[in-house]
């Protein structure tokens, strides 16, 4: 597909049936689902997650190099407060299936709230979505026009030409939302941007410390920080449960803590807070009950960057694809987008965060 001399984003809303139908005919005998072949966010299906972009790239005659550079998903904003704003969602982690949840969130932001959304992926040299390829991010140039960026990254080792688009966006003051492992988003081994290995700690407000809860055994129940309960990001963000465990975190004094995460005794939504479990807090050097106090799991910062511009930053250590089965967590992210863009007056606690179609995320690895 050519558009003004370049490959168009793979957007099922803009692809005509004359283009979609041959692709569906190719994929339907294997996938068994015509709707899933329409390039929407059902990348979360294990089959489509691995072959959809590759199959589409092949059908369109793209080389592997072209696929790596161009393959991203674009959702055109419909009616809503975000009309005219561009949100770029960047996936790339080996554990928590950000390649599944970010398309779902992008579609919510576009369909329900009017934002134009572009989702970027990590792919391998065959053009398949492959979060294990730490050097890959598709269509990084999309960040050049971003009004806000959502990252769900872990130990990325991007080339300078890709890092430049992210760093330039950060320096011009673009609001950034960091999910889960984005506290340790980069592990750059060469190039001009290795100082961004500490982006989590220095900018978002925390780096990788430890699993405070038992990994794959203990869940996380969000509890609003009483002193900040009126913060707009928290409006309507209720009954949050994440089946990813609580991270150890100590945001800096200038951070506004919005929510803490009680360590629960199982991964079930009705699980109870653990009692009597103690661990050494690395920030304080003291042994404490894991829930007294509970660890911060969501906070904001407003920080001046080296170019003199101020970024609004929102970080949550929740964010596995399975965590986003929680309506409250989805609403907190939508609220975070509006807050990041200075649109607090558009937050009413009733944001529609219903996924478009099914959302059946894969459990994290």
Q: Where is each model-derived feature located?
A:
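Acidic, Ala/Val/Gly-enriched low-complexity intrinsically disordered segments
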Residues: 11-13, 17, 25, 30, ...
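Helical hinge/lid and interdomain linker segments adjacent to catalytic or ligand-binding clefts
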Residues: 68, 73-78, 88-90, 94-185
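Extreme N-terminal basic, low-complexity initiation segments
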Residues: 1-15
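Hydrophobic h-region of N-terminal signal peptides that target proteins for export
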Residues: 57-65
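Bacterial N-terminal signal peptides that target proteins for export
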Residues: 27, 33, 39-53
